[in-house]
């Protein structure tokens, strides 16, 4: 059997304390554990950072990075730092207010293996409102 590729999941976070726990919970519930999570906090002023620190301390595949002096540098610089810190063959992005189905990493890895010449993969999304009801499904 072919070795599963390592995927680096980059989560850029800025003042998402309300959602980041659910996002990280969805990542640690993945059926395939062959991936790393790179969370870059962009100078949050809410309680995001302590929540992320707790996860990074509890789970060895979650790494936390911040900009020097915990500055706010914007999304582009935050994503760039995440890419620089990643170790994966492949990069996936998870927004800090999103959550993934439990088999999403497995789906990505299977798709990569089935399409070795692909430069990128795009998958469908489901938009869930604040009442946890689907609003859009692609």
Segments predicted by a language model, with ranges:
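Nucleotide-sugar donor-binding/catalytic module of glycosyltransferases
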Residues: 1-138
């Amino acid at each position: 059997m072919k070795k599963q590729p390592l995927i680096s999941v980059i989560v850029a976070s800025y003042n998402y304390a309300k959602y980041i726990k659910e996002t990280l919970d969805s990542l640690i519930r993945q059926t395939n554990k062959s991936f790393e999570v790179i969370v870059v906090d962009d100078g949050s002023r809410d309680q995001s950072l302590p929540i992320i620190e707790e996860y990074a301390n509890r789970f060895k595949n979650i790494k936390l990075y911040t900009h020097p002096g915990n500055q706010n540098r914007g999304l582009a610089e935050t994503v760039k730092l995440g890419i620089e810190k990643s170790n994966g063959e492949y990069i996936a992005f998870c927004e800090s207010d999103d959550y993934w189905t439990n088999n999403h990493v497995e789906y990505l890895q299977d798709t990569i293996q089935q399409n070795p010449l692909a430069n990128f993969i795009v998958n469908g999304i489901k938009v869930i409102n604040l009442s946890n009801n689907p609003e859009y499904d692609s």
